[in-house]
Amino acid sequence: MFPSSDFSFSPSSLFSAYASLTGFLMLFRSMLHDFVPEKLRSYFSSLLDRFFTPKSKYLTVIIDENFGLNRNQVFDAAEMYLRSKIGPETERLRVGKIPKQKHFTISIERGEEILDTFEESEVKWSYVQSENEKGDKVKRYYELTFEKKLRDKVLNSYLTHVVAESEEIKRNLRVVKLYSRDVYASDDDDGMAGGNWGCINLEHPSTFDTLAMDPNAKKKIIDDLERFLKRKEFYKRVGKAWKRGYLLYGPPGTGKSSLIAAMANYLKFDVFDLELSSIYDNGELKRVLLSTTNRSILVIEDIDCNAEVRDREAENQEDEQIKGKVTLSGILNFIDGLWSSFGDERIIVFTTNHKERLDPALLRPGRMDVHINMSYCTGLGFRTLVSNYLGLDGLNHPLCEEIEALVDSTEVTPAELAEELMQDDDTDVVLRGVISFVEKRKVERSKTKKEVSICKATDDDEKQNGSLGCVKKKKKGGKQKGKGKGKGKAKTYLI
């Protein structure tokens, strides 16, 4: 049906066909270069490339080290973020350390890749470092590769997540500083604070885990701090300065300073310790407070020792002794007045041993937001001390239950109990010593209260009878002149 063909594919015929085709292509190329403009040739070439090259489903974003003349914030955030994503599959790392750092800085070397997952979507990071032809400039950048369908999620949500995580990592690595106007600036000073503030590293070991406080009270403080950190937009919406005021009150040795250190270590906030006695007047107070930094805790200890805060009427006196001093109105102006809006993310802490001595204006809501009673140690607080100092669970030792009952019924401070727990290395000896100490303290407290009660009752009776009080002190000059018996009465003092 199909006649056979005499045509055969011999090597000579194939070579002849190849030569003819090659000659035609060379002639076509020559004509193309001679008669078709270069721009038109490039246009058709790009069309052919796009038509025949398969489209990739991946998109790559370049994150350069510099953005214009400034550092690229996204590059720095990615560098910090990827340090926490280094896994065992990474083959090459870079390690460095500067004198002020406590830990080594570890990052990936060029050519290394890191896979990351965000909301069930996978992305790939690559670190690239290249030099120019002269070798005097190094270009560093990250390549972020992901599927094109994830473009909006990565460029909006994921990169925002990377920046936020990097800020959190930096806060955790940051060394908390303690500022005071009595300390000279050191090499560790970052220069952020002015106003003659000097600083040292706050290496106080106190944390909320080591505080001898009721667990529920500690949880309330932590929850309040967390809410404060997350409410930037809330404070802005309600028209309030982004700050929080705490009043710590209670007898000495109950852990007020330790709580402040625990708050600073938890928040990674610097601490500015201000002594009002070192401030000349309200103008200097304003300058000093304006020189503090954001994300800091301003501490004014023993606020009850300042006469102007105890007695508001002292502001209205005109004598020279009062002039040139810090007044209560000057302090209140920085708590909730016009000057309270300076800075963001600030915490103000006042401490006092005698809350009742403070002017009521200082205690009103909106000025001191949280009042924390740092009272005597409780049984639960003693458990924390036993765990910290003896390294054991108080519930596992037979003497601890007896001590907890004694502590709950006695006025004894955590500092006093901590001192007793360091008296010996033997646990049984220490705990028996604590029992003896608490029992002795209980007897002393009971005796003191009884004496005060008797003295007060006696004084009340004698006052009603018009006679002397508990302790009598005669006026100088011996006998008093005059006929009346009431003249020259001794002054009465209560112990």
Curated annotation (Swiss-Prot):
<keyword id="KW-0547">Nucleotide-binding</keyword>
<protein>
    <recommendedName>
        <fullName>AAA-ATPase At2g18193</fullName>
        <ecNumber>3.6.1.-</ecNumber>
    </recommendedName>
</protein>
<dbReference type="InterPro" id="IPR025753">
    <property type="entry name" value="AAA_N_dom"/>
</dbReference>
<dbReference type="GO" id="GO:0016020">
    <property type="term" value="C:membrane"/>
</dbReference>
<keyword id="KW-0067">ATP-binding</keyword>
<dbReference type="InterPro" id="IPR003959">
    <property type="entry name" value="ATPase_AAA_core"/>
</dbReference>
<dbReference type="InterPro" id="IPR003960">
    <property type="entry name" value="ATPase_AAA_CS"/>
</dbReference>
<dbReference type="Pfam" id="PF00004">
    <property type="entry name" value="AAA"/>
</dbReference>
<dbReference type="InterPro" id="IPR003593">
    <property type="entry name" value="AAA+_ATPase"/>
</dbReference>
<dbReference type="GO" id="GO:0005524">
    <property type="term" value="F:ATP binding"/>
</dbReference>
<keyword id="KW-0460">Magnesium</keyword>
<comment type="similarity">
    <text>Belongs to the AAA ATPase family. BCS1 subfamily.</text>
</comment>
<dbReference type="InterPro" id="IPR050747">
    <property type="entry name" value="Mitochondrial_chaperone_BCS1"/>
</dbReference>
<keyword id="KW-1133">Transmembrane helix</keyword>
<keyword id="KW-0378">Hydrolase</keyword>
<feature type="compositionally biased region" description="Basic residues">
    <location>
        <begin position="471"/>
        <end position="495"/>
    </location>
</feature>
<dbReference type="GO" id="GO:0005783">
    <property type="term" value="C:endoplasmic reticulum"/>
</dbReference>
<keyword id="KW-0812">Transmembrane</keyword>
<dbReference type="InterPro" id="IPR027417">
    <property type="entry name" value="P-loop_NTPase"/>
</dbReference>
<dbReference type="GO" id="GO:0006950">
    <property type="term" value="P:response to stress"/>
</dbReference>
<dbReference type="GO" id="GO:0016887">
    <property type="term" value="F:ATP hydrolysis activity"/>
</dbReference>
<feature type="transmembrane region" description="Helical">
    <location>
        <begin position="7"/>
        <end position="28"/>
    </location>
</feature>
<dbReference type="Pfam" id="PF14363">
    <property type="entry name" value="AAA_assoc"/>
</dbReference>
<keyword id="KW-0472">Membrane</keyword>
<feature type="binding site">
    <location>
        <begin position="250"/>
        <end position="257"/>
    </location>
    <ligand>
        <name>ATP</name>
    </ligand>
</feature>
<feature type="region of interest" description="Disordered">
    <location>
        <begin position="451"/>
        <end position="495"/>
    </location>
</feature>
